[in-house]
């Protein structure tokens, strides 16, 4: 396997591509924007036919990924913490019925650095009774996304 030097967002995107991801649907918002941009600009993703979409908001992005997952393909949605509030309804519905979709929330937990508010979205994972992972470095970010599929 080729060794790469990647930022955290890039490691998440590369893990998705290497896992055979089919579609990424996102709403732009720093710092999660870089994940989707990496997929859009990736030669490997283009060769694999990965579809990347910017959506009207986080709710429609997650709903699009849920639709892809219903079709049996691997999908991911990326957003920052406040976006999770916007897509709360489809998030809980997907958790209840067991939809296999990966949701990546970036720039979370107290001590905000890239947002207008501060929240701890880990409570969403507990509330929905779904796995919630917290990588501590780029390799863990890659591995968690790659093996998560």
Regions found by a protein language model. Give the residues of each.
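Thiamine diphosphate
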Residues: 1-140, 145
